[in-house]
A protein has these predicted regions:
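N-terminal active-site wall of soluble small-molecule enzyme domains
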Residues: 1-3
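Short beta-strand->alpha-helix junction loop in the catalytic core
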Residues: 16-17
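Flexible mid-to-C-terminal extensions adjoining Fe-S/redox cofactors in radical SAM and related proteins
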Residues: 186-299
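Radical SAM enzyme [4Fe-4S]-AdoMet core and its adjacent flexible, acidic
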Residues: 6-9, 25, 29-34, 38-199
């Protein structure tokens, strides 16, 4: 309600497991503009296995509620080794539930995805097969459904311009009140993130060390400092650099020019090698070829 009064667009990003009709109606009445629901696959058994709980049917019911309440629906699916071979069927499901927008998001290796890299990383053959399917669907559905294909970060020559550059346009406030330049910035343990209880958003944006640390180009080491792409991809992702090298200030190893590119390549090759050893256990069997570590609640 406060966001609507401030003239902001609000989008609920949810697993939808607890999204009842009453709750969705209340959110709409308060000014909610749209809803994004995450799906794991097209088939209930595979989807529930990936989620680690029986959630697929609840998501379908929630999607129906969203459409009946005439809220725009975004269908989001994270693509990885266990579900990417189902891409055609996943797109068909997005059409079936009446999505206005579909995000085909190749897995980004942060948080628990980073912990499970070997199990989640698609083969290069899977990616080569999937992209034309996504592009064909995007063309076919033009004017009916917006479709976004998020490129696989570990398989590109240059890194993504994460958040369009650190501290340039994005600000996030987590449930504890900490203010972050990107949703996963808390992965950088060497940075202190100021809290809205202690400082205003204006002060944090303009003056905090966390927002200024990687803002602009002055912080950049070589080869970023003299690279013609320095204001295109801004040195890549700081969180990814920290996760892969322990130092958030180095060139993102996802960049082919990074002196740390070998760290990423070794990780990718090790993951593929580990999966080859389990080559008889594939996503076609509705499971991962390697054990998956699920997040559990700690009390």
């Amino acid at each position: 309600r406060a966001a609507r009064e401030a003239g902001l667009y609000t989008n609920l990003i949810t697993s939808a497991v607890g999204l009842s009709r009453q709750r969705c109606q209340s959110l709409k009445d308060a000014g909610l503009d749209s809803v994004q629901i995450s799906f794991q696959a097209d088939q209930p058994a595979l989807a529930d296995m990936i989620a680690g709980t029986k959630a697929h049917q609840l998501k379908l019911e929630a999607a129906k509620i969203v459409r009946e309440l005439k809220l725009p629906l975004t269908f989001n699916v994270v693509l990885h080794r266990a579900n990417i071979d189902h891409l055609l069927e996943i797109i068909a499901l997005a059409e079936e539930v009446g999505a206005a927008r579909t995000e085909l998001a190749n897995v980004q290796f942060y948080g628990w995805a980073f912990t499970n890299t070997a199990a989640l990383l698609p083969t290069r053959e899977q990616l080569k097969k999937a992209e034309p399917i996504a592009m064909a669907a995007k063309e076919r559905l033009k004017g009916k459904m917006e479709m976004l294909w998020v490129v696989p970060d570990y398989d590109e020559q240059f890194p993504k311009p994460c958040m369009n550059g650190w501290g340039r346009r994005y600000i996030a406030v987590n449930p504890a009140g900490d203010v972050l330049p990107c949703p996963t910035a808390s992965a950088i343990k060497t940075l202190k993130f100021d809290n809205v209880r202690n400082y205003s958003l204006e002060w944090i944006w303009n003056h905090s060390d966390s927002f200024n640390r990687f803002r602009g180009t002055a912080w950049m080491p070589e080869p970023c400092k003299s690279c013609e792409r320095r204001e295109i991809d801004f040195g890549g992702c700081r969180c990814q650099a920290a996760l892969l090298t322990g130092d958030p200030g180095v060139t993102d190893p996802a960049c082919s020019l990074s002196p740390y590119r070998h760290v990423l390549e070794e990780k990718v090759n090790a993951a593929h090698k580990e999966n080859i050893l389990r080559k008889n256990e594939t996503s076609e069997n509705a499971g991962f070829s390697l054990p998956v570590i699920y997040r559990t609640l700690k009390w």
